[in-house]
A protein has these predicted regions:
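Glycine-rich, mobile lid/loop segments that gate access to catalytic sites or pores
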Residues: 13-17, 73, 77-80, 84-229
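Short, Lys/Arg-enriched N-terminal segments with co-localized hydrophobic residues
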Residues: 1-6
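Short, charge-patterned binding micro-sites
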Residues: 47-65
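N-terminal, positively charged regions that mediate nucleic acid binding
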Residues: 7-47, 52-53
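Electropositive polyanion-binding surfaces
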Residues: 21, 38, 237-243
């Protein structure tokens, strides 16, 4: 009573993923296709998706564009830039956009032919005006990406998660930090945990927000050699909330 809207104490958790997470791989393939379409034809309307499993990449959808796009080349280039050196096969099923749909979205004053419901807010607890947990999870994922590209035993797939503790509506401490990273088979979990704690977590987390009770969970499930599309099947749009 007297505390207003806020619960006396609660925890808020957010996650992020690296570019090598297979969901984000699919997003990046679709984004790169859209970028190429808009580069050639600024009036392009693209509804192209990607799905990946093991060595198969499926690119499919509808395209309303005058651009000439090499879908296979773009998909394979994305995989290479992310850091996956396995051999992939690309199956493309992209048709010309329906004239009925194209006619409904082709007017200059209309920028979209569908609808959605979104919500969001600015939060002054960080410089980015985002809640602490999500912005810190993103920073950890970005740092993990940087360290991975300089560390031979780290591989592209990864996920981060931050749980923040609030008391009377105010951020008080970080309760839990989770970092899961794919790696090669020739490294111990102790080496991985030391690397991630010193090179990823410590440079990102404000030391004033951690204490002796803060939990650091680095590869909590143990070995993470099989990752990317070989460990999961994924598709575009699954990380919209994370984004």
């Amino acid at each position: 009573k007297g505390k207003g809207f806020f619960m006396p104490k609660f925890y808020f958790t957010s996650e992020s993923v690296t570019s090598g997470h297979p969901d984000k791989v699919c997003d990046l393939i679709a984004d790169s296709i859209l970028d190429e379409a808009l580069r050639q034809d600024p009036t392009s309307h693209m509804a192209v998706e990607a799905t990946i499993k093991d060595d198969l990449i499926l690119v499919y959808g509808e395209a309303g564009t005058n651009a000439v796009i090499d879908y296979e080349k773009i998909a394979l280039q994305v995989m290479k830039e992310i850091g996956y050196d396995e051999e992939y096969h690309v199956l493309v099923k992209v048709n010309k956009q329906s004239s009925e749909i194209n006619g409904a979205v082709a007017h200059d004053e209309i920028s979209a032919g569908d609808q959605g419901i979104m919500f969001g807010y600015a939060d002054d607890e960080t410089e980015e005006l985002m809640p602490y947990a999500i912005i810190t999870a993103h920073k950890l994922a970005k740092k993990l990406e940087e360290v991975r590209r300089q560390t031979p035993f780290l591989r592209p797939d990864g996920k981060t998660q931050v749980t923040a503790e609030y008391v009377d509506g105010k951020l008080t401490r970080v309760d839990t930090i989770v970092v899961s990273t794919q790696h090669t088979a020739d490294v111990t979990q102790e080496e991985i945990r030391k690397c991630i704690k010193e090179q990823v977590i410590d440079p990102v987390i404000d030391p004033s927000l951690v204490d002796e009770n803060t939990k650091y969970l680095i590869n909590p499930s143990g070995s993470f050699v099989l990752g990317g599309s070989w460990g999961d099947s994924d598709t575009t749009g699954r990380k919209i909330v994370v984004d």
